[in-house]
């Protein structure tokens, strides 16, 4: 098993419903350590930059509008096979298809407002972490 880091967002819908603590509890209960975290209210430019890979897709404008509609939590999680572990905790992108007990099944209302984002690969995690955090902001958890 490999110790990895992954990137996570708690989206505006889940922040507005005060689910931050419950979601953090899910991460930690699953063995993922939070090594960096901050609350942000994304600008349009930040959201467009982060989601640039989707800029030609029909849902891009709605995605940017949603992600700038309120505060978000961004965090870096660390643990064994963190990318896969985090995605399993999140559940399917569409909460209607998410397994019971996953974050999206429990806290999301729709595929558009689906509570959370997680990196889909180590390469994505590295890029997404660097978008929001400097190396100095990452705090190794040795205890």
UniProtKB/Swiss-Prot annotation:
One GO cellular component, as annotated: cytoplasm
Localization annotation: Cytoplasm
InterPro entries (UniProt xref): NDK-like_dom (IPR034907), NDK-like_dom_sf (IPR036850), Nucleoside_diP_kinase (IPR001564), Nucleoside_diP_kinase_AS (IPR023005)
Family annotation (Pfam families): NDK
UniProt entry keywords in alphabetical sequence: ATP-binding, Cytoplasm, Kinase, Magnesium, Metal-binding, Nucleotide metabolism, Nucleotide-binding, Phosphoprotein, Transferase
SMART domains per record: NDK
EC number: 2.7.4.6
Residue numbers binding ATP: 11, 59, 87, 93, 104, 114
Active site: 117
Reactions catalysed, as given in the entry: a 2'-deoxyribonucleoside 5'-diphosphate + ATP = a 2'-deoxyribonucleoside 5'-triphosphate + ADP; a ribonucleoside 5'-diphosphate + ATP = a ribonucleoside 5'-triphosphate + ADP
Main localization of the protein described in the UniProt heading: cytoplasm
HAMAP family: NDP_kinase
Family membership noted in the UniProt record: Belongs to the NDK family.
Database matches in NCBIfam families: PRK00668.1
Protein name: Nucleoside diphosphate kinase
Species annotation: Shewanella oneidensis (strain ATCC 700550 / JCM 31522 / CIP 106686 / LMG 19005 / NCIMB 14063 / MR-1)
